[in-house]
Amino acid sequence: MDNKSVLLDGYGRRINYLRISVTDRCNLRCMYCMPQEGIPKRAHHDIMTLEELQEVAVALVELGIDKIRITGGEPLVRKGIVGLVRELSKCEGLNEITLTTNGLLLSEYARELKAAGLKRVNISLDTLNPQKFEYITRGGSLEKVLEGIKEAQSVGLTPIKLNTVLIGGFNDDEIEDFVALTVDNEIDVRFIELMPYRTGSRLWSLEKFISSDSVLKKVPSLEKIKSEDISSPAEYYRIPGALGKVGLINPITCKFCENCNRLRLTSDGKLKLCLHSDSEIDLAGPLRRGEDIRGIVLDEIKNKPREHSLEDGEYIKRDMFKIGG
């Protein structure tokens, strides 16, 4: 099949971006994301092998996917992750492989990942205060994350994007500090609205919600800039003369569904057409039976929803750490 194919959904949107969750396991226990006790260990046959994930990815690239992001859980806890990146990088028609991580293991893997073909990384980081970091992650080391950021910069996994979930009463006093990181560094900081999910429901309240207006009020020197990618969920701003950018991702107050270009593949082989929908398509079963999963995707892609319904209180049942954001 021609790897220059174009994959379109029922609304004429070009779908060219696949996010692969390689594991639902994580080495942190962030309060809004994962239970303190962790999650039950799953049987091996319930999780796709890296070879199976690669096979699905190759099939989707043949249909028109040209960008892949590897996520988790925490993807760097999955054994063989560097090998997966290396194999995917050989895939003709794939232009970019990126990875989202909490950064704890990044100092160990950054150089190998870069050599394997990874282009850049997004790092989840909600505070620059070591004590607050240990609290929100239930025991994590901010120092290790900062080491990972430095190593990623050193080997060229840039521009680095920091994903910061805004939580009222926790890190809203650090907005200016995060923005300051963009001035002299090739780092983009993206502030993300706290979204209501099962694990994070107790954190979800009006008092803890922070909209993008609050960020702009705290840093009035931010100037809006034109986005280079209309499918990006972020609206970007910059302090004049800064090397990096500031992004605002507002799934609650400002939908970005109109230009959605992405699919999500979970570690147990389910294809999600929309992050905020419980609808899933099983690809693991058909793949293991030797069926052509490309035909399944082509049949199902027309059912990708026009938009989410978060504002109506419709929240998905699957935990975010099982999807990869």
Curated annotation (Swiss-Prot):
Binds 2 [4Fe-4S] clusters. Binds 1 [4Fe-4S] cluster coordinated with 3 cysteines and an exchangeable S-adenosyl-L-methionine and 1 [4Fe-4S] cluster coordinated with 3 cysteines and the GTP-derived substrate. Its EC number is 4.1.99.22. [4Fe-4S] cluster 2 binds at residues 257, 260, 274. This is GTP 3',8-cyclase. Its cofactor is [4Fe-4S] cluster. Residues 10-229 form the Radical SAM core domain. Belongs to the radical SAM superfamily. MoaA family. Keywords: 4Fe-4S, GTP-binding, Iron, Iron-sulfur, Lyase, Metal-binding, Molybdenum cofactor biosynthesis, Nucleotide-binding, S-adenosyl-L-methionine. Monomer and homodimer. Pathway: Cofactor biosynthesis; molybdopterin biosynthesis. GO terms for biological process: Mo-molybdopterin cofactor biosynthetic process. SMART domains: Elp3. Disulfide bonds: none annotated. [4Fe-4S] cluster 1 binds at residues 26, 30, 33. It holds the Pfam family Radical_SAM. S-adenosyl-L-methionine binds at residues 32, 73, 124, 195. Catalyzes the cyclization of GTP to (8S)-3',8-cyclo-7,8-dihydroguanosine 5'-triphosphate. It comes from Peptoclostridium acidaminophilum. It comes from the Bacteria. GTP binds at residues 19, 69, 100, 161, 262-264. GO terms for molecular function: 4 iron, 4 sulfur cluster binding; cyclic pyranopterin monophosphate synthase activity; GTP 3',8'-cyclase activity; GTP binding; metal ion binding; S-adenosyl-L-methionine binding. It catalyses: GTP + AH2 + S-adenosyl-L-methionine = (8S)-3',8-cyclo-7,8-dihydroguanosine 5'-triphosphate + 5'-deoxyadenosine + L-methionine + A + H(+).
